[in-house]
Regions:
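Short glycine-enriched nucleophile-adjacent loop
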Residues: 16, 38-49
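Alpha/beta-hydrolase fold nucleophile elbow
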Residues: 23-35
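A conserved short beta-strand
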Residues: 50-62
Length: 186
């Protein structure tokens, strides 16, 4: 457990295991992570283009900005779990913060980001700032900002589930091509 360090390899190794499963089709995989799992999903998309689609719900994208809003995260999570944290705080946090390397996310993996506007655990600005960067990079991204929703999106649970399923069906199950991200239309 390194909060986004070597523990990422556990997920990548699962793909190798799946390749040996007769019922698994590793040419059509999606990945979904929520909260800390969302951070892990961004890290996966930085290392691999094996996924047909990815969904992140309530994922932190800038751990440095998170410290003033959630100081307990530094004390009980970062300092406890991240190797060499005290000597290389900024470097280690940026390694785990997609906002600093959005241009390194797999460009062929469409991404859906969900976030609640009333999320106190992971500030909504995390999603909004990354969305702007992804838009500038012309990365295929779908964004669902749920008004008044808390971190778990409990107020819109069914809507969120339906949106996620539709997104995965579109890109993973039905294998639709990536959208044209250039300006077009009349």
């Amino acid at each position: 457990e390194e909060f986004g360090g070597q523990d990422l390899n556990d997920v990548l190794n699962l793909i190798l295991l799946l390749a040996n499963e007769p019922k698994a089709d590793t040419s059509r995989m999606g990945v979904y992570g929520f909260s800390r799992g969302g951070m892990m999903t961004y890290l996966l998309l930085r290392k691999s283009c094996q996924f047909k689609a990815a969904v992140v719900g309530g994922g932190p994208t800038d751990l440095l900005k998170w410290i003033p809003k959630r100081p307990e995260m530094e004390t009980y999570v970062y300092a406890e779990l991240i190797p060499d944290y005290h000597n290389n705080k900024e470097v280690e946090l940026k390694k785990r913060s997609a906002i600093y390397w959005a241009d390194e996310l797999c460009p062929t993996t469409p991404l859906m980001i969900l976030h609640g506007s009333a999320d106190w655990r992971v500030a909504p600005e995390n999603a909004l700032e990354l969305l702007v960067k992804l838009f500038e990079l012309k990365h295929p991204v779908r964004f669902l900002f749920l008004e008044g929703a808390q971190h778990s999106l409990a107020e819109f649970r069914q809507e969120a589930r339906n949106s996620i399923r539709s997104f995965f069906d579109h890109y993973v199950k039905n294998e639709n091509p990536l959208p044209d991200m250039e300006l077009h239309g009349r």
